[in-house]
UniProtKB/Swiss-Prot annotation:
Transmembrane segments: none annotated. Coiled coil: none annotated. Pathway: Amino-acid biosynthesis; L-histidine biosynthesis; L-histidine from 5-phospho-alpha-D-ribose 1-diphosphate: step 4/9. The active site is at D8, D129. One of its GO terms (molecular function) is 1-(5-phosphoribosyl)-5-[(5-phosphoribosylamino)methylideneamino]imidazole-4-carboxamide isomerase activity. It comes from Oceanobacillus iheyensis (strain DSM 14371 / CIP 107618 / JCM 11309 / KCTC 3954 / HTE831). Its main location: cytoplasm. Belongs to the HisA/HisF family. The gene is hisA. This is 1-(5-phosphoribosyl)-5-[(5-phosphoribosylamino)methylideneamino] imidazole-4-carboxamide isomerase. Gene3D superfamilies: Aldolase class I.
Length: 240
């Protein structure tokens, strides 16, 4: 299972939000590039980055910073947040980003999603941000009437290979992932599943590993020190 340290960027800084609430922000670093280098130095094999400004506005506000992050690292990065055009996908791919994550656009524009998957294949992932079983959009600020599980099955049928599944009510709450929901997602698809939201302890990480998930994104727990990246990565190496 790949561990993805999370770098969420807002106003050019590395931050974390509680349950996606833009009014509950903690700034962890003024330099996302330096933060990314720290995670790479600690042994990270893949990085997860989000343009929070972009997720809310639909514009790729922090694209230059994310390009700098991609070019500063020797490990792959995946990027999400406000990516709603083929032009922006192409900019990220050209900048060295390994995987581009579509969120709102994947829900609201099926033609765009299909074209993106046909054009970029496994370089496209889709973010499923769920609240009580329904998908939220626009940086989690809007609830949709789209049910998560049927939509996940639909994604697989059009050729999506990787999804990021986030339980919004768990995100940043340090209360553990929603294992029951993740199990339901896993039963519904053979796509690569990256779990996100609520990973708080090494025990959470171990439980996710037993589910044979493709990956887990960890944010607040790494920044607050309740999980040490090197410790869980050493556990990964021992298990291999």
């Amino acid at each position: 299972m790949i561990i993805f340290p999370a770098i969420d960027i807002r106003n050019g800084k590395c931050v974390r939000l509680r349950q996606g609430d833009y009014n509950q922000e903690t700034i962890y670093s003024n330099s996302p590039v330096e933060m990314a280098k720290e995670w790479e130095a600690s042994g990270a094999e893949y990085l997860h980055t989000v343009d929070l400004d972009g997720a809310k506005s639909g514009e790729s506000n922090n694209i230059n910073i994310i390009q700098d992050v991609a070019q500063a690292l020797s490990i792959p990065i995946q990027v999400g947040g406000g990516i709603r055009s083929l032009e922006v996908i192409d900019k990220y791919i050209q900048a060295g980003v390994s995987r581009v994550i579509l969120g709102t656009a994947a829900i609201t524009d099926s033609v765009f999603l299909q074209t993106a998957v046909e054009s970029y294949a496994e370089k496209i992932a889709v973010s499923i941000d769920a609240r009580n079983g329904f998908i939220a959009t626009d940086g989690w600020t809007k609830n949709s009437t789209v049910e998560a599980i049927p939509f996940i099955k639909q994604l697989e049928s059009i050729g999506v290979k990787t999804i990021i599944y986030t339980d919004i009510l768990k995100d940043g709450m340090m209360s553990g992932p929603n294992f029951q929901e993740l199990d339901a997602v896993q039963q519904a698809t053979t796509m690569n599943i990256i779990a996100s939201g609520g990973v708080t302890t090494e025990k959470d990480v171990q439980q996710l590993k037993t589910m044979n998930l493709y990956g887990a994104i960890i944010g607040k727990a790494l920044y607050d020190g309740s999980i040490k990246l090197q410790d869980i990565l050493e556990g990964e190496m021992d298990a291999r």
